Design a protein with these regions (language model features):
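A short, flexible loop at the N-terminus of ABC-type nucleotide-binding domains that lies
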Residues: 2-32, 64-69
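The feature captures the beta-strand-to-loop junction immediately N-terminal to the Walker
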Residues: 46-48
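Helix-to-loop junction immediately C-terminal to a conserved catalytic motif
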Residues: 61
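Conserved ABC ATPase "signature" region
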Residues: 123-140
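Conserved ABC ATPase signature
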Residues: 145-149, 153
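Hydrophobic anchor residue at the start of the ABC signature
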Residues: 159
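Conserved catalytic motifs of ABC-family nucleotide-binding domains
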Residues: 166
Length: 171
């Protein structure tokens, strides 16, 4: 069993003429996107409001939805696998930590992603504790309510939940 995030294998990301159109829109949010990010590279995505940054991040995380939610063209790959099929390889920290705080207790919230990966219970809780330590919430009890957390604590809790999953790609 490993709780060491540093032992996680970094993921490579490739886009081939990728685009996405939300079902409620006439025009594509992004179109003809091409890039190749090698494992371990760090990339900054910068752009104006409405430029498609969140759409690309959601696409990489595999959470854009099916055909009823929009139309995809081209390929968006993580380690050569369609991003929609590689969800466990990618961790997404949302802009608004309140939208990522799902459960009532800090430990449950941190463990949530690992539970969805069907990891053994002991490993889930070891990873959750290690992730809370990494983000500076080592003092936080697993049964601590998420309701009274400050904005900064919520952001760190969201990051801990993602790090506990040991993603190869952190967004």
């Amino acid at each position: 069993m490993t709780t060491d995030v540093q032992n996680t294998t970094a993921a490579g990301v490739t886009a081939h003429d990728w685009g996405w159109r939300h079902a409620s829109r006439k025009d594509f949010a992004l179109r003809h996107v091409d890039f190749d990010i090698k494992p371990g590279e760090r990339v900054l995505l910068l752009g104006a409001s409405g430029a498609g940054k969140s759409t690309l991040m959601s696409g990489l995380a595999g959470v854009l939805g099916g055909d009823d939610e929009g139309e995809q063209e081209g390929e968006l790959l993580i380690d050569g696998v369609d991003a929609r099929q590689a969800r466990g390889r990618c961790g997404l920290v949302l802009q608004d930590p309140d939208s990522q705080t799902i459960l009532e207790r800090a430990g449950d919230d941190t463990a949530f992603g690992c539970e969805n990966l069907n990891l053994p219970k002991d490993e889930i809780w070891n990873r959750a504790r290690a992730a809370l330590d990494i983000v500076g919430l080592d003092y936080m009890a697993f049964d601590r309510s998420t309701r009274g957390l400050s904005g900064g604590q919520r952001q760190r809790l969201a990051l801990a939940g993602v790090l506990a999953m040991h993603p190869g790609l952190l967004l």
